[in-house]
A protein has these predicted regions:
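Basic- and hydrophobic-enriched, low-structure N-terminal and domain-boundary segments
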Residues: 1-157, 171, 421-423, 487
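The Walker A/P-loop phosphate-binding site
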Residues: 122-151, 355-385
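Glycine-rich phosphate-binding loop of nucleotide-binding enzymes
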Residues: 127-217, 478, 500, 504, ...
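Conserved ABC ATPase signature
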Residues: 146-152, 161, 380-412
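Hydrophobic positions in the central parallel beta-sheet of the AAA+
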Residues: 185, 379-381, 427
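Helical/strand "switch-coupling" subdomains that flank nucleotide/phosphate-binding cores, especially
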Residues: 211-358
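Conserved P-loop NTPase motor cores
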Residues: 391-512
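Conserved P-loop NTPase motor module
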Residues: 525-564
Length: 564
């Protein structure tokens, strides 16, 4: 394809008319280069149409007349018709340095397809695929948050089957390859990341191989414990443990639970004093110190504990009723089992003698890697529904809420003590519409969603970045999309509020190209291509306009482009 600049010229776009064209050759979305003096201007074809009278406009005729001796011009003057291209200007380069597009493109400048990327590969550069419709590898600059002195937030969207999970795994692999000191916390809702890190299933890339086994996978509550007396009290209240003793009034219930917590702390202190002959302050006693033995002792003592009864009820007639219930074997057994079920979320010693880590232990691991300057930590929380036990969604939200709170607290503390360091951690929220949905119908999810939105707004300077993965932007809070500087848009968002959002953010011409993305599940398509639009500061071609890429179709192609 060859053409010449013709028609409207503006800082953001120009028109060109084709002078050479091979019938059937793809045009829309293709990258073009325009030589303008000592500058190379790169643009993208965003529209085209046939015009029957190229010389209808006086100014255009005048420009052509100046070049009437040119063979190309003579042909156009004779035909007076041609295919006009609308070209979006992306960047200008001079000697490998980006120049502002603050100059007019010369009329009749030559336009050609871009055949090779005009910049050399640099540090922190990686590839997920090729520019759409070309064989040119599309470079991305992937720097860790310590190097950048701030974190990036990512938004990845596309319908089921769009390839977003595979794309994210490739992106994480590249970040780890280029930034070995970067931390990752992955909240895995459906198990695909867990399988990739374990080397299970037939996947495009095994993250286990990339991290060479240096990662931690936790499946709450099996091997990860909650922590904190306030949270313990919250769970006791929510699970209504006192109902088994016929205690229903909120104040009475709270009094009983507070008393149980006090007795647990008191018994732990006694045990520690016996073991170490040391007095341990109450503030150093945590739920991490709970054991099954201590819990059984405290629960059994409640049967004949006058103070417990008086803490729950002030009136003697109610106290007598509670004493009677405490001595009912069936009722008391249910009460004890309810408490033990909650305690199981907090105890760190398992029945087989092995130990769990607490949420705080996991977050402290990120901090230690930063302070020591050692290799980053990669932690996967396997939050698949069938493994979260009892109150599935509610308990999953608790684990997510608590680990994100600890992460935020540690990030703020590190920043306040040492502004030269940040936590350098990327948090991946897979199936993010479960955690920060646009429409919420329960208090637990509302609290979690509000906190995540707060983190999106506040944590960049602390070195905590977020990656939101979802099927549709309209399924999550708009603030999350707006706060994400890096966006990956896969297929399936061509209608409704999602299409309107893309049009609003990227401009109406974006959809002209985006709608042409092939569906990898299309049985009539000979190539099972996975395509994405990428925008944000990680792209090289333009800092304002999105790149359109075709993702590598083979593991070998991905590895060859980035590891060889």
């Amino acid at each position: 394809m060859r053409g010449i600049v013709y028609g409207d010229i503006a800082p953001s776009h120009v028109q060109a008319v084709l002078t050479e064209y091979q019938e059937g050759e793809a045009i829309l979305g293709r990258l073009v280069q325009i030589k303008n003096g000592d500058k190379l201007v790169i643009g993208r074809v965003v529209n085209f149409y046939r015009r029957s009278d190229l010389l209808k406009d006086y100014d255009q005729a005048k420009h052509f007349d100046r070049r009437k001796d040119s063979e190309t011009t003579q042909e156009l003057l004779n035909l007076r018709e041609g295919i006009v291209l609308e070209i979006e200007l992306l960047t200008a380069l001079r000697g490998g340095v980006r120049e502002p597009l603050n100059f007019p493109i010369k009329h009749l400048s030559e336009v050609e397809f871009l055949e090779e990327f005009p910049l050399e590969r640099t540090a922190y550069m990686g590839y997920l695929g090729h520019f759409w419709g070309t064989n040119i590898k599309a470079p991305l600059i992937l720097q860790d948050f310590q190097t950048l002195k701030e974190a990036y937030h990512f938004f990845v969207a596309g319908q089921t089957g769009s390839g977003k999970s595979t794309l994210v795994q490739m992106l994480l692999a590249l970040y780890n390859r280029l930034n070995p000191r970067m931390n990752f916390l992955i909240l895995d809702t459906v198990g695909e990341f867990t399988a990739s890190f374990k080397g299970e299933r037939e996947l495009f890339v095994y993250l286990k191989d990339v991290w060479q086994g240096q990662m931690e996978i936790y499946t709450p509550p099996e091997d990860l414990a909650l922590e904190g007396w306030e949270l313990f009290t919250e769970l006791c209240l929510e699970n209504k443990i006192m109902k088994h003793l016929d205690v229903k009034s909120v104040d009475n219930v709270k009094g009983g639970i507070d008393y149980i917590v006090e007795k647990l702390i008191e018994r732990i202190k006694q045990k520690k004093k016996q073991q170490f002959s040391l007095f341990q302050p109450t503030e150093d006693i945590t739920t991490k110190d709970i054991t099954d033995e201590i819990v059984k002792e405290v629960i059994n003592d409640l049967k004949n504990d006058r103070n417990f009864v008086e803490r729950v009820y002030k009136m003697k007639e109610y106290q007598e009723g509670l004493r009677y219930t405490l001595n009912n074997p069936v009722r008391f057994k249910k009460f004890a089992e309810a408490i033990q079920g909650i305690v199981g979320q907090f105890t760190v010693v398992k029945p087989d003698g092995t130990t769990k880590k607490t949420i705080r232990d996991v977050v402290d691991g990120f901090l230690k890697s930063v302070l020591k300057g050692s290799s980053g930590k990669c932690v996967v929380l396997n939050l698949t529904l069938y493994k979260t036990g009892g109150n599935l969604v509610g308990m999953r939200s608790k684990y997510v809420r608590e680990i994100l709170r600890w992460l935020y607290e540690v990030g703020v503390d590190l920043y306040c003590k040492n502004e030269d360091l940040n936590l350098n951690t990327l948090v991946v929220l897979e199936e993010a519409h479960n955690y920060v949905p646009k429409w919420v119908d329960d208090d637990e999810t509302t609290t979690l969603a509000n906190e995540i939105v707060k983190y999106f707004m506040e944590t960049r300077k602390f070195g905590i970045g977020w990656m939101c993965i979802t099927t549709r932007p309209s399924n999550v809070r708009r603030e999350v999309f707006d706060q994400s500087r890096v966006r990956f848009i896969g297929i399936g968002l061509t209608s409704g509020p999602d299409a309107e959002l893309l049009k609003e953010v990227f401009g109406p011409e974006f959809l002209n190209i985006y709608r042409l993305f092939p569906d990898p599940s299309d049985p009539l398509s000979p190539k099972k291509e996975v395509c994405f639009a990428i925008s944000g500061p990680i792209t090289v071609l333009s800092r304002q306009n999105p790149d359109f890429i075709t993702v590598f179709s083979s593991k070998e192609g991905f590895i060859k482009a980035n590891w060889e």
